[in-house]
Amino acid sequence: MAMFHSLPSIHVKHQKNTAELESVIMPVPAEVTISMSQHIGAPCKPVVKVGDTVKVGQLIGDSEAAVSAPIHSSVSGKVKAIEQIFNARGAKSEAIVITTDGEQTIDETLAPPAIGAELEDVLVAARACGLMGLGGAGFPTSVKLVGLKSAAIDTLVINGAECEPYLTCDYRIMLEKTDLLLEGAELILRHMPGGRAVIGIENNKPKAIEKIKADAAAKGSKLEVLELKSRYPQGAEKVIVYEATGRVIPEGKLPSDVGVLVMNVGTVIKLAEYVKTGLPLTSRMVTVDGGAVAEPKNVWVPIGTKLEDIINFCGGYKGEPAEIILGGPMMGTSCRDDQTPISKTNNGLLVFNEKEAKMAAETACIRCGRCLRACPLSLSPAALDRAYHAEDVEALKALHVNLCMECGCCAYVCPAKRHLVVYNQLGKQMIKK
């Protein structure tokens, strides 16, 4: 089937309100709640018990499963409880509650990993770091990097597009940690003989483009900078692979099947940082914004910090909050309440007021075709809508519902305000039954 088209997908209001604000580090909260399920794959099991004293970077959760990533304490303090919570994905998971001591004492056993000429050293380091995709998906990095054992992978695509409205944490980290970005790219390129590394950045981020180009030239880095048009969903995996290489990822396949390794910019930077310092993934930068936040910021947050504590650090609520979203407004998830703890994959915390959160009433499809023209994969969302409501599983398959990447373009442009993404999600579940 045809995929992609020459016309832009959709243009959304950028709302990059925090783009020029340097990141800040929030104080350690009184308590953190660290979920044992923060990644795609098997959840971790606690390796500490109630009453144990823990330090920053200490291993507190692990799994023997092939697809998983260990979890480390983001604070120093004492384990208060091990309990079931609703995590940032809205699912129930086991979690470790730690009362902090305010000292942030680092685990003395931590040390930079030994990185030699073998790829295995990098795989071991990525796993020991507890690293996963920091752009939202959360796939364990050590598992993804196994693909480098195949000579078929010849291109590293670093995703710096950050096309979601409001979010600017990737932009800030590109500006603030450019050296580590280049070091991370070179580390991966060593295990991709004759390979190419390219970072895709939307052209509404000229400072990042210019800085990375200048620093790469000064250091003799092989990293190429690809200026992307500012359109949504430019940062979607299938889209950025096509833009960077001209290759199309077939339905049901991965970037590795077309010779590409895709990594978020924050993931590459953290890998390089871990190789230098030996400090695992215990904190991340989060964009905090929205009309119901008093002081929007880009904040370095200890993993497991409650949303309430982050919002209070940003001046508290401005008026009455109507909705909390983790991630961006297009693909993020609505949150139960502000007691939810932040996870490794949460790049945004948006707090909307009633005006921003208000949804228009859904009406009948008028068959205008806007959703079809907006879809970057040339699917037919209106036809999928009808197939779902008719419970026509064969039609859902024929219309390639599983190819939908749930970017939200169709629902964004729909004049009838149809919940098209939701129907595609439910359609996928219908096929599995």
Mark where each language-model region is.
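Hydrophobic alpha-helical positions that pack around
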Residues: G194-L307, F313-K318, G328
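Internal alpha/beta scaffold segment
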Residues: I115, D121, R172-G220
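Short, well-structured beta-strand-loop connectors
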Residues: K49-D62, A81
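Ferredoxin-type iron-sulfur electron-transfer modules in oxidoreductases and energy-metabolism complexes
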Residues: N347-E362, L372, P376-K433
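Acidic low-complexity segments
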Residues: A81, F86-F139, V146-A151, P206
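Gly-rich Lys/Arg/Thr-decorated short loops/hinges at beta-loop-alpha junctions or inter-strand turns
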Residues: G133, L156-D170, A292
